[in-house]
From Swiss-Prot:
Keywords recorded for this protein, A-Z: Cell membrane, GTP-binding, Lipoprotein, Membrane, Nucleotide-binding, Prenylation, Protein transport, Transport
One CC-aspect GO term: plasma membrane
Chain intervals for the UniProt region annotation (Disordered): 173-203
Protein name according to UniProt: GTP-binding protein yptV1
Length: 203
């Protein structure tokens, strides 16, 4: 058993380009924010260890590029994910309309029982908001997944979003005494070398 943590969960951030996936990850992992973040090329990841119900959970969070040309690269990351966070921009109706396409990608590539979370980012831009909270909440309720509005800029609900996902995965694992099917994600106290927290960026 690794003494550093009890669980290792792999999370994936997906959604249209420019919705703030990288900013959400920066805020959660490093508690920083930048207006001029460069578009993600391919995939990047960061790690943060959290405590939940007395258990230490290491979250390995993969940030994927939203552009179509990177879709074949990023689709391979779906399979091993325990949780997938679908992000849209509350000031961009099209990014919300495209959520259905991203959910279809999850159905196509991810494990059958993967946990999902819908996040409407940039909630601080109240004057530019076009996606109604109630409409998004109703959509999330209809498909049976949690929903939160966040702001990476002022940190609203960012912590809660990732912790909600961690709790959902942990609860699912606790209610699953049957071992996962071969090829599916396996959550256990992991073997191997501890991952260096100091530098987890790909580039």
């Amino acid at each position: 058993m690794n003494p550093e943590y009890d669980y290792l969960f792999k999370l994936l951030l997906i959604g249209d380009s420019g919705v703030g996936k990288s900013c959400l990850l920066l805020r959660f992992a490093d508690d920083t924010y930048t207006e001029s973040y460069i578009s993600t090329i391919g995939v990047d990841f960061k790690i943060r260890t959290v405590e939940l119900d007395g258990k230490v959970i290491k979250l390995q969070i993969w940030d994927t590029a939203g552009q179509e040309r990177f879709r074949t690269i990023t689709s391979s990351y779906y399979r091993g994910a325990h949780g997938i966070i679908v992000v849209y921009d509350v000031t961009d109706q099209e990014s919300f309309n495209n959520v259905k396409q991203w959910l279809a990608e999850i159905d196509r590539y991810a494990s059958e029982n993967v946990n999902k979370l819908l996040v409407g980012n940039k909630s601080d831009l109240t004057g530019k908001k076009v996606v109604d909270y109630q409409a998004a909440k109703a959509f999330a309720d209809e498909i049976g997944i949690p929903f939160l509005e966040t702001s990476a800029k002022n940190a609203t609900n960012v912590e809660q979003a990732f912790m909600t996902m961690a709790a959902e995965i942990k609860n699912r694992m606790a209610s699953q005494p049957v071992p996962p099917k071969p090829g599916g994600p396996v959550v256990r106290p992991t073997e191997g070398k501890p991952i260096n927290n100091k530098s987890s960026s790909c580039c």
